[in-house]
From Swiss-Prot:
Gene3D superfamilies: P-loop containing nucleotide triphosphate hydrolases, Probable tRNA modification gtpase trme, domain 1, tRNA modification GTPase MnmE domain 2. Keywords: Cytoplasm, GTP-binding, Hydrolase, Magnesium, Metal-binding, Nucleotide-binding, Potassium, tRNA processing. Mg(2+) binds at S245, T266. Its cofactor is K(+). It comes from Ralstonia nicotianae (strain ATCC BAA-1114 / GMI1000). Its main location: cytoplasm. It is found in: Cytoplasm. Binds 1 potassium ion per subunit. Residues 231-396 form the TrmE-type G domain. This is tRNA modification GTPase MnmE. InterPro entries: G_TrmE (IPR031168), GTP-bd (IPR006073), GTP-bd_TrmE_N (IPR018948), GTPase_MnmE (IPR004520), MnmE_dom2 (IPR027368), MnmE_helical (IPR025867), P-loop_NTPase (IPR027417), Small_GTP-bd (IPR005225). One of its GO terms (cellular component) is cytosol. Pfam families: MMR_HSR1 (PF01926), MnmE_helical (PF12631), TrmE_N (PF10396).
Amino acid sequence: MTSPTVSDAASAPIRTVPIAAIATAPGRGGIGVVRVSGPDVRAVMQAVCGRLLPPRQATYLPFLDADGAAIDRGIALWFPAPHSYTGEDVLELQGHGGPVVMQLLLSRCLRAGHGIGLRVAEPGEFTRRAFLNDKLDLAQAEAVADLIEASTEAAARSAARSLDGVFSQTVHALVERVIHLRMLVEATLDFPEEEIDFLEAADARGQLADIRARLDGVLAQARQGALLREGLHVVLAGQPNVGKSSLLNALAGAELAIVTPIAGTTRDKVQQTIQIEGIPLNIVDTAGLRDTEDEVERIGIERTWAAIARADVVLHLLDAADYRAHGLSAEDAAIDARIAEHVPPGVPTLRVINKIDLAGAAVPGRVDAQPPEVWLSARDGSGIELLRAALLEIAGWQGGGEGLYLARERHLSALRSAREHLTIAADHADQRAQSLDLFAEELRLAQEALNSITGAFSSDDLLGVIFSRFCIGK
């Protein structure tokens, strides 16, 4: 994406009403920020700061109320359009981060800007304006929210790369190749009488194969980026007292769940997000599965089945001594069957044989069974690394987060759609005499799918959904 210049008429910001919001998180903090963006913001600056400020310089001064008394003292920053986050005139007021002070400062800005139509910003509206004014493309705008919400260091670094435009540049490179191939097809359609065969001369089939191969690489990397963003939802299930809470504590490296030898100690689900190699894992410890007359425990068991229905992977825990001596019990076989009924299609189950430290000669290990098994001891940690490795394998993590960009399911869907259209295009290329128009159309649809990632082609409905999930001050 080419940065706009002052002389470029196309870089002029879209005319909108001015907006304001507290840009920092709710609560108390050392610093709080009120952001104002839009036309005629100088009027707010003059009223609140008492004077006009030099562009892009930090100025320490009092923030004034309508009577000229100081609300707070802090730093004011003035960014004239188009050289600002939104591409509009932007005023940022950095004061002390108390909620009362911030609300007073925001209210003062709104009153000072009443005559110019200043209003409170909607969620994500600052970033939406940055997108509409070509300061960010859509993938970069989404990366702003992903960076804020990142739950691991790897996710944060990948989001930062997306914000820098790494993902967008990769998609743009694919689009350029598709456009070039489309030009060859259109030339062949428009000039059929020419002696030169544009497609044969340019090796159109070879170009298409190259585009598909590059797209496969982007899709594989995007899947890894999506895993960094979304993580894995892991549910611990099994009969009471098989060590589910102990396993949660072992994976988390902290005493998060109460552990006692009394069956039914856990009556409601306990959730904790941990990370393995930068992948966030949302681990859910659940109530033991059994028939019970206890109303509270029964509700907990119902929530267990609800959690299983939303899982990305289910760990069915069994007692190693019982399993080694007698195999799968009727109760555990019934649990296996019910898990299969509740999990979404394609969601794997991993059998975790726990308490090997109490099972004689049992040793930690992985068994290639159906479902796969991991033998471990949550109490002394034996085999925990094997379980971590199994979870990464199930997730499809290939390691090496360096260079990855964060991706969303929306991006994966667009990439898969583009690949499908390119596959159909390849079929038409093999039957070019009858299908040249269809070849061109599939290339157009592939380009459209890729453009939807960066927002070069996006519906208003899609934009509304994306930006509504931002925090107010972004």
